[in-house]
Amino acid sequence: MAHPHKNAIAEMDASSLISIIAESKMTYVRENLSIFLHESQIKLLRNVKKHEKPHHKKVRIREYEKADKDDLFNMHLGLYLNKYKKLEKNGLIEIDLNPDNGLPYDCLLTGKGIEILEEIARLENEWEGIVGISEDDREVLKKLALDSFEISYKHKKNKGFIF
């Protein structure tokens, strides 16, 4: 029996197809993860790992020093800090509210946070096997990622993202 959405999918543009694939992967990860996390929390946890890298920390410090600390900035600071506090409550990160690096706060992964990120990576690899991503598919995806990366990179750089 043919899949009921086969014809609809055949007519979709690339953007819609990419969205379906991304949603499938995230659904698989969230359904099989040993802890309940929202999609945004998974993304935030990954950002903590990324921001621990010395290069990324230097960029954040530099952007924070240049930032206009107006009311809108402080509102965003509070919103992000509240999101990080939810991860801290789950024991995934530690928040330093008085770091000695010039930032208003800094976050570090805990052992549990590292374990959850490893579990997420394992689940993503399982999902790749389930949906049948081949080496040829992976090469096409790498090319698409490289070709599209510059758009988001320039945007983040222009906006001076530091949170």
Residue ranges and their predicted role:
Residues 27-79:
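N-terminal helix-turn-helix DNA-binding core of bacterial DNA-binding proteins
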Residues 1-39, 90-92:
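N-terminal leader segment of winged-helix/HTH proteins
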Residues 88-98:
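A short, conserved structural fragment
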Residues 36-37, 109, 133-137:
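Alpha-helical hairpin
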Residues 118-163:
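Terminal interaction helix/tail motif
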Residues 99-120:
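Basic, amphipathic "hinge/linker" alpha-helix immediately C-terminal to the N-terminal HTH DNA-binding motif
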Residues 79-90:
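Basic amphipathic alpha-helical segments that dock to polyanions
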